[in-house]
Each structure stands twice: as structure tokens, then as C-alpha cells.
């Protein structure tokens, strides 16, 4: 396996809370995939703060993943196409769907993710790996004078 890319993201949890309040909850529906949304609602029902922290970590993971694959938030990377779920052990993992899953499979890309949150911030780190041969290095830029 070779490293394809890395990405990290830090988000202020209060910013996520403000956007969630301003949008009446639509922000969570825009950003979270269906499995993430179920977990968000369950956690938020038990504790508003834990629900918002969950949303913040998932938002951060999507941002970090988009950086690790080198696309940013551009097709085929969309908010709902990538979900960060947890194993029974608590270990997070990512699941891609739709065109993003196809794009990743075509390049042999897999990912490892970690997320964490504290009172004020959520952070995530993603490493993407591939079995495929790396793309050729870009040609050096040369300057010509006339």
C-alpha cells in the first residue's frame, strides 16, 4: 500500500451549533448520510451537546477526507456520499456510496480515519492509501524567454 493522500480538519463546535440552530436542523440533513443521521438523532435525544459534537466530528471527517483524496468538496465528493461510522469497538471507519465509491474503487483507494472532540473543538485526520501505481509526477515548469 502506498499513501495516496492525507487530510486533517478542525472545527469549532459552537460554529456547528450556530449553523444547526439557524437552519432549523436542515444542516444535519444536508451533511450527514442516512446511518450518520440516525446516530445523530439518537445522541441528540440523549444529550444536545453530544449530538452536536457528533455532527461536528462527522463534518470534520468529511472535510479531512476531501483533502486526503485531493478533490476538496467537488464531485464526486459530496457530503452525503461519505459516512463515518463506528465499529462495535468504537473505532471509526468510512463508507462511501454512489459515484464516490466508484471513483475510489477505480483508483484502488481505501481510507483510515480518526475523529476526536473536546468541549470547544472537533478534529479529524484521514489517511488514504492505494495499491495502484502512483500517477506520474508533473513535468517541471520551465521558463522561456523570447
Swiss-Prot record:
Cofactor: Mg(2+)
GO cellular component: cytoplasm
Designated name of the protein: Holo-[acyl-carrier-protein] synthase
Record's function text: Transfers the 4'-phosphopantetheine moiety from coenzyme A to a Ser of acyl-carrier-protein.
Cellular localization per UniProt: Cytoplasm
Biological source species: Burkholderia ambifaria (strain ATCC BAA-244 / DSM 16087 / CCUG 44356 / LMG 19182 / AMMD) (Burkholderia cepacia (strain AMMD))
A biological process term (GO) from this entry: fatty acid biosynthetic process
Source organism phylogeny: Bacteria, Pseudomonadati, Pseudomonadota, Betaproteobacteria, Burkholderiales
NCBIfam families associated with the record: acpS, pantethn_trn
Keyword Endoplasmic reticulum: no
An annotated Gene Ontology molecular function: magnesium ion binding
